[in-house]
Amino acid sequence: TTLEPFDHPYNTTALNERAVELAMVHGFVLAREHDLYPTPAAEAGVLGRCLEVGNVLSHYEDYIVLPPRRVVDRFEVAPGVENIDVFDIKGTYDTIISISTIEHVGVDDGRGYPGAALDAIFHLRSLLAPGGRFFCTFPTGWNSALDHSLNWGEISRLAVTEVYVARNGEDWGEYGANGRRGFYPRPYGLTQPWAEAVWIGEFGPL
Protein backbone atom coordinates (compact mmCIF):
# COMPACT_ATOMS: atom_id res chain seq x y z
CA THR A 1 0.00 0.00 0.00
CA THR A 2 1.00 3.65 -0.35
CA LEU A 3 1.26 5.69 2.84
CA GLU A 4 -0.11 9.22 3.18
CA PRO A 5 3.04 11.20 4.06
CA PHE A 6 3.26 13.78 6.81
CA ASP A 7 4.26 17.29 5.76
CA HIS A 8 5.81 19.99 7.94
CA PRO A 9 8.08 22.97 7.15
CA TYR A 10 10.75 21.88 9.65
CA ASN A 11 13.71 20.06 8.08
CA THR A 12 11.98 19.56 4.69
CA THR A 13 9.94 16.82 6.32
CA ALA A 14 7.91 15.82 3.26
CA LEU A 15 11.10 14.97 1.35
CA ASN A 16 12.68 12.59 3.85
CA GLU A 17 11.91 9.66 6.12
CA ARG A 18 10.18 11.90 8.67
CA ALA A 19 7.23 11.97 6.27
CA VAL A 20 6.37 8.37 7.18
CA GLU A 21 7.89 8.19 10.66
CA LEU A 22 5.75 11.04 11.97
CA ALA A 23 2.61 9.74 10.30
CA MET A 24 3.19 6.40 12.03
CA VAL A 25 4.08 7.84 15.44
CA HIS A 26 0.93 9.96 15.33
CA GLY A 27 -1.10 6.79 14.89
CA PHE A 28 0.85 5.08 17.67
CA VAL A 29 0.20 7.97 20.09
CA LEU A 30 -3.55 7.90 19.42
CA ALA A 31 -3.73 4.12 19.83
CA ARG A 32 -1.58 4.19 22.96
CA GLU A 33 -3.77 6.83 24.58
CA HIS A 34 -6.79 4.61 23.98
CA ASP A 35 -5.02 1.52 25.33
CA LEU A 36 -4.03 3.28 28.54
CA TYR A 37 -7.13 5.42 29.04
CA PRO A 38 -10.04 4.00 27.01
CA THR A 39 -12.83 6.01 28.67
CA PRO A 40 -14.21 9.08 26.87
CA ALA A 41 -13.36 11.21 29.90
CA ALA A 42 -9.65 10.40 29.63
CA GLU A 43 -7.36 13.35 29.15
CA ALA A 44 -5.97 13.57 25.62
CA GLY A 45 -2.24 13.25 25.23
CA VAL A 46 -1.67 10.99 28.23
CA LEU A 47 0.86 8.22 27.64
CA GLY A 48 1.65 7.32 31.24
CA ARG A 49 5.29 7.70 32.24
CA CYS A 50 6.76 8.68 28.90
CA LEU A 51 10.35 8.81 27.65
CA GLU A 52 11.59 10.08 24.30
CA VAL A 53 15.07 9.03 23.22
CA GLY A 54 16.33 11.51 20.64
CA ASN A 55 14.89 15.02 20.61
CA VAL A 56 12.62 14.82 17.58
CA LEU A 57 8.98 15.34 18.49
CA SER A 58 9.47 18.77 20.06
CA HIS A 59 9.99 20.12 16.54
CA TYR A 60 6.49 18.96 15.54
CA GLU A 61 4.35 19.58 18.61
CA ASP A 62 2.11 21.91 16.64
CA TYR A 63 0.89 18.72 14.93
CA ILE A 64 1.39 15.90 17.43
CA VAL A 65 0.05 16.66 20.91
CA LEU A 66 2.18 14.92 23.51
CA PRO A 67 2.15 14.88 27.31
CA PRO A 68 5.00 16.06 29.50
CA ARG A 69 7.77 13.55 28.98
CA ARG A 70 11.42 13.00 29.71
CA VAL A 71 13.52 13.77 26.64
CA VAL A 72 17.05 12.38 26.39
CA ASP A 73 19.45 13.19 23.55
CA ARG A 74 23.16 12.65 23.96
CA PHE A 75 24.22 15.48 21.65
CA GLU A 76 21.41 17.95 20.89
CA VAL A 77 21.37 20.85 23.33
CA ALA A 78 17.88 22.27 23.80
CA PRO A 79 15.66 23.41 26.69
CA GLY A 80 14.33 20.46 28.66
CA VAL A 81 16.62 17.93 26.96
CA GLU A 82 18.97 15.78 29.05
CA ASN A 83 22.33 15.20 27.36
CA ILE A 84 23.16 11.71 28.61
CA ASP A 85 24.02 8.41 26.96
CA VAL A 86 21.20 5.99 26.23
CA PHE A 87 22.78 3.36 28.51
CA ASP A 88 22.74 5.80 31.42
CA ILE A 89 18.96 6.20 31.28
CA LYS A 90 17.25 4.75 34.33
CA GLY A 91 13.67 4.57 35.50
CA THR A 92 10.46 2.79 34.57
CA TYR A 93 8.25 3.90 31.71
CA ASP A 94 4.87 3.04 30.23
CA THR A 95 5.74 4.48 26.83
CA ILE A 96 9.10 5.00 25.10
CA ILE A 97 9.43 6.69 21.71
CA SER A 98 12.58 6.88 19.60
CA ILE A 99 12.53 8.22 16.05
CA SER A 100 15.60 7.70 13.83
CA THR A 101 17.95 7.77 16.79
CA ILE A 102 18.85 4.18 17.66
CA GLU A 103 20.85 3.72 14.43
CA HIS A 104 23.38 6.31 15.61
CA VAL A 105 24.25 4.29 18.72
CA GLY A 106 27.59 2.58 18.13
CA VAL A 107 28.15 4.43 14.85
CA ASP A 108 28.16 8.17 15.56
CA ASP A 109 28.97 8.23 19.27
CA GLY A 110 32.63 7.20 19.22
CA ARG A 111 32.01 3.57 20.18
CA GLY A 112 32.94 2.09 16.82
CA TYR A 113 30.64 -0.87 17.49
CA PRO A 114 27.37 -0.86 15.50
CA GLY A 115 26.03 -3.73 17.62
CA ALA A 116 25.59 -1.26 20.47
CA ALA A 117 22.35 -0.21 18.76
CA LEU A 118 20.88 -3.65 19.44
CA ASP A 119 22.16 -3.48 23.01
CA ALA A 120 20.39 -0.12 23.34
CA ILE A 121 17.11 -1.67 22.20
CA PHE A 122 17.41 -4.32 24.94
CA HIS A 123 18.31 -1.66 27.50
CA LEU A 124 15.28 0.46 26.66
CA ARG A 125 13.02 -2.59 26.75
CA SER A 126 14.35 -3.29 30.24
CA LEU A 127 12.97 0.10 31.32
CA LEU A 128 9.40 -0.70 30.26
CA ALA A 129 6.76 -1.31 32.89
CA PRO A 130 4.52 -4.38 32.49
CA GLY A 131 2.31 -3.68 29.51
CA GLY A 132 4.65 -0.94 28.32
CA ARG A 133 5.44 -0.21 24.69
CA PHE A 134 8.60 1.05 22.97
CA PHE A 135 7.89 2.66 19.56
CA CYS A 136 11.05 2.73 17.46
CA THR A 137 12.02 3.73 13.93
CA PHE A 138 15.33 3.58 12.12
CA PRO A 139 16.46 3.95 8.50
CA THR A 140 18.31 1.15 6.77
CA GLY A 141 21.80 1.61 5.41
CA TRP A 142 23.14 3.55 8.39
CA ASN A 143 23.94 0.91 11.00
CA SER A 144 25.30 -2.40 9.68
CA ALA A 145 24.26 -4.35 12.78
CA LEU A 146 20.65 -3.25 12.44
CA ASP A 147 20.67 -4.11 8.74
CA HIS A 148 22.09 -7.54 9.56
CA SER A 149 19.38 -8.08 12.17
CA LEU A 150 16.75 -7.25 9.54
CA ASN A 151 18.27 -9.63 7.00
CA TRP A 152 18.28 -12.48 9.51
CA GLY A 153 14.90 -11.71 11.07
CA GLU A 154 16.27 -10.96 14.53
CA ILE A 155 14.37 -7.69 14.86
CA SER A 156 11.17 -9.42 13.73
CA ARG A 157 11.47 -11.98 16.50
CA LEU A 158 11.86 -9.25 19.10
CA ALA A 159 9.12 -6.89 17.92
CA VAL A 160 5.45 -6.98 18.86
CA THR A 161 4.50 -5.27 15.61
CA GLU A 162 6.55 -4.05 12.67
CA VAL A 163 6.15 -2.34 9.32
CA TYR A 164 8.73 -2.06 6.56
CA VAL A 165 8.51 1.11 4.48
CA ALA A 166 10.51 1.98 1.38
CA ARG A 167 10.56 4.62 -1.31
CA ASN A 168 8.51 3.87 -4.38
CA GLY A 169 9.38 6.68 -6.76
CA GLU A 170 8.15 9.87 -5.12
CA ASP A 171 5.90 7.95 -2.74
CA TRP A 172 6.49 5.66 0.22
CA GLY A 173 5.23 2.10 0.04
CA GLU A 174 4.44 -0.23 2.94
CA TYR A 175 5.99 -3.66 2.54
CA GLY A 176 3.98 -5.45 5.15
CA ALA A 177 3.44 -5.79 8.86
CA ASN A 178 4.95 -8.82 10.57
CA GLY A 179 6.07 -10.15 7.20
CA ARG A 180 8.73 -8.80 4.86
CA ARG A 181 6.97 -9.33 1.53
CA GLY A 182 9.79 -8.05 -0.64
CA PHE A 183 11.40 -5.60 1.74
CA TYR A 184 15.18 -5.47 2.05
CA PRO A 185 17.55 -2.97 3.70
CA ARG A 186 18.54 -0.33 1.17
CA PRO A 187 21.65 1.87 1.19
CA TYR A 188 21.11 5.23 2.85
CA GLY A 189 21.08 8.11 0.35
CA LEU A 190 21.08 5.92 -2.75
CA THR A 191 18.89 8.20 -4.88
CA GLN A 192 18.67 11.34 -2.72
CA PRO A 193 20.25 12.64 0.53
CA TRP A 194 17.92 10.77 2.89
CA ALA A 195 16.76 7.26 3.73
CA GLU A 196 15.53 4.84 1.09
CA ALA A 197 13.84 2.49 3.57
CA VAL A 198 12.71 2.60 7.19
CA TRP A 199 11.84 0.00 9.81
CA ILE A 200 9.01 0.98 12.16
CA GLY A 201 7.91 -1.18 15.05
CA GLU A 202 6.98 -1.67 18.67
CA PHE A 203 8.69 -3.67 21.39
CA GLY A 204 7.31 -4.93 24.66
CA PRO A 205 9.15 -5.22 27.97
CA LEU A 206 11.79 -7.88 28.63
PLM regions with names:
Residues 27, 55-67:
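Conserved SAM-binding loop of SAM-dependent methyltransferases across substrates and taxa
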Residues 149-206:
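Class I S-adenosyl-L-methionine
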Residues 9-14, 106-118, 145-149:
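Short, flexible/disordered intra-domain loops and linkers
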Residues 1-44:
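Class I SAM-dependent methyltransferase Rossmann-like catalytic core
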Residues 112-133:
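A short glycine-rich, Lys/Arg-flanked "PGG" loop and its adjoining helix->strand segment in the class I
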Residues 97-102, 106:
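A conserved beta-strand element that flanks and buttresses the S-adenosyl-L-methionine
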Residues 62-98, 115-120:
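Adenosine-cofactor binding site in Rossmann-like domains, unifying the SAM/SAH pocket
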Residues 137-141:
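Short strand-turn motif at the edge of the Rossmann-like AdoMet-binding core
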